[in-house]
Regions:
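Phosphate- and other anionic-substrate recognition elements at nucleic-acid/protein interfaces
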Residues: 1-138
Length: 138
């Protein structure tokens, strides 16, 4: 991980994103905010944060890969993390959007997260078709 980049941890949900901004040289995020999960709001955030180097990080989930694709179209580095491989400290059971976003930023900076390959739209469509067929047959 590039220690000179700002890491932006994101907890992505259908309606909004909680964003934790961890600049270089800081141990904790300096800002945590919630934005709408809409194209214009994401573009505004990305434009604001890409004045320097930034990497956007979020866990794969039911919202898919659209946020990663949009950030990529804007010229940003965006990585999707495997949630099953995210380290969890014993006793750390309280889950909030803010804590999840902060944790992603810190763990990515520390090099403790596993990045996944984002499927193409065609691969994703084929996967959806296979799953729908399996559901219909079952």
């Amino acid at each position: 991980m590039d220690q000179h980049s700002t890491v932006v941890g994101m907890d992505v949900h259908k309606r909004n994103l909680t964003v934790a901004i961890l600049p270089p040289g800081k141990a904790r995020p300096i800002e945590v905010l919630t934005i709408e999960n809409r194209g214009k709001a994401i573009a505004r955030m990305a434009t604001r944060l890409t004045t320097g180097r930034a990497v956007f990080v979020y866990e794969a989930g039911p919202c898919g890969y659209e946020v990663q694709r949009q950030l990529h179209r804007l010229g940003c580095r965006a990585v999707v993390i495997a949630p099953a491989l995210t380290p969890i400290r014993p006793g750390d059971r309280v889950k909030t959007n803010r804590r999840d976003a902060e944790k992603l930023a810190r763990l990515y900076r520390a090099g403790e997260l596993t990045e996944i390959r984002v499927p193409t739209r065609e691969e994703e469509a084929a996967r959806d078709l296979v799953r729908a067929r399996e559901d219909a047959v079952a």
